[in-house]
Amino acid sequence: MGSQNRPPPPRKRQPPPPEDHLVTYKRRRSKETQPLPLMANGANSKKDAKAQHWISWRDTLHGFLQSPAISQGGGIQTCIRHALQHNPCLLTNGVVVHTEFKGNPAHSQGEEAKVQHPNGAAGGKVVSADAAIQDAAAAASSEANKAMCNNALFDILVSQKFALLCHLLLGTFHVNKPGDVIDLEKIDAKMRNGDYAHNPALFDDDIQQMWEKFEQVGQEMTGLASNLSTISRVSYQKQASGFSEAEVAEHRIEEISLPGAVHVVTKESTTTVQLAPCDSSHSTIPKRTVPPGRDLCPCDGCGTKVDVEEGLICDECDTMYHFACVKLLNPDIKQVPAIWHCSTCSFKKKELAADTTNNVAHDCLHGGNCVLCDQLELVKTEEEDPKLPIKIELAEEREGSSVSSMGEDNEPDLSTTALSNLCKHCGTCEDDDKRFMVCGHPYCVYKFYHIRCLKTSQLAIEQQKKLGCWYCPSCLCRGCFQDKDDDQIVMCDGCDEGYHIYCMRPARNTIPKGKWYCTFCKIRRAAEGMHKYEDSVLKIHGNSKHACNVNQSKDSEGDGTEK
């Protein structure tokens, strides 16, 4: 009985199982690495810019996981999940923790060892064992290639530059689905199909193509933004100044020819600039004065008007550009240069310096490229009185002048400038530093042109390299630059440039009757016609207003006498 009342012995306390320790370790590890609350706190404070772009990065990766293609698994889904588990906000020393994606090489090696040591297998199975070894080696190589591509993609996803790109798309451009812009579905599909496992170089090509697309879009956006900025500024100035489109079209015409007179019009400016005349003659070409209130020139780059204060003028041809347009083409230009030449004149100088044509001879002291000598040739002259009659003084032929000699039987009816050995455009003779280009057509009526008086399109050096000689704009079609069908070439009655009837716009089947004008001269004539119409309207309005004033004065006098 006593033994029955005896209390049971105390049980020994069992130690906790090792599984509890592992659970506690996992729970403690989970508590130490909580990237999302840290990033959320940074976003709420709005003081840590780094946390801002990492939040955009997190949202972008979550968007990738929600994509129907990537959510299938087997592709880059595992890599994205590992990137999300990585906490870039805790990196202080710039050390990136790499996650190694490996296949199961130990398992492969075990299988290989098992095949190599069959332990009692028959000798007839040696051939199948070798095939199994090769398959295992190929599988191991594929797994290694796939792991290498995953590691490379992981490094890209956890980089700060990628996070900044995500923040640019989400925070700046407010792209709802960055996955539509950053196209990873193609890479995911190839990763799932095993293309990268067989050829890992394809992964690098696809990644580079994606970034090159971003670079191209960025460059296009930069160029469009610069152009739109220039157009916006010029459009506002145009609306504020009140100039019409007809005036802009008139200013865009670089060369103009009126019936009975031939002259060159540079970009209009308030100062008339003339080449220094030679000793034997002076220019017989009348100057075109700038009408009052039209001292604004169009930019040769964008075609809109530009004020003299904000423009950049070529020191060779007086062509005006917006400084912003010049800076867009030449980003190295930071401020307005003291001496500047446009691209056309720069190309012309290079062509002259390279002696690309046999008709051009460089025997001047400085080789024809001295900017100072070019500047000294430009002299300011007073505007000629338009009421004075135009007189043509024939220049004496100087020694050494490059004049084409023809037989008397075949001599055509030359123009006054050709008979006087004068330039067709400026009406002055040839000089050491103003050399002639001589038209090689035997029936050319103009013959002589100063090189500096011709535009690059009129010289057409590249188009005439294969021809035996140089043809002027009147003797060679300006549409096709082909030395053929001279009987079908028609010269414009405004600028004397020649065109084949099938090169006209629109093309013709027969030679037009009466006068014919090219496209540029049609625009110029339309602008001149509008100006004449405006002047006639103002004249009629002025006369009627004057008549009304006279009638009102007579009525007031009559009322006074009656009183």
From Swiss-Prot:
Pfam families: PHD. Expressed in shoot apical meristem and leaves. Keywords: DNA-binding, Flowering, Metal-binding, Nucleus, Repeat, Transcription, Transcription regulation, Zinc, Zinc-finger. The keyword DNA-binding applies. Residues 1-46 are annotated as: Disordered. It comes from the Eukaryota. GO terms for cellular component: chromatin; nucleus. One of its GO terms (biological process) is regulation of transcription by RNA polymerase II. A zinc finger (PHD-type) spans 296-348, 420-472, 474-524. GO terms for molecular function: chromatin binding; DNA binding; histone acetyltransferase activity; transcription coregulator activity; zinc ion binding. Disruption phenotype: Late-flowering phenotype under short day (SD) and natural day (ND) conditions. Extreme late-flowering phenotype under long day (LD) conditions. It is found in: Nucleus. Its main location: nucleus. Induction: Circadian-regulation under short day (SD) conditions. Expression increases after dawn, peaks just before dusk and gradually decreases during the dark period. Probable transcription factor involved in the regulation of floral induction under long day (LD) conditions. Promotes photoperiodic flowering by repressing GHD7, a major floral repressor. Seems to function independently of HD1. Interacts with TRX1. This is PHD finger protein EHD3. It comes from Oryza sativa subsp. japonica (Rice). The gene is EHD3.
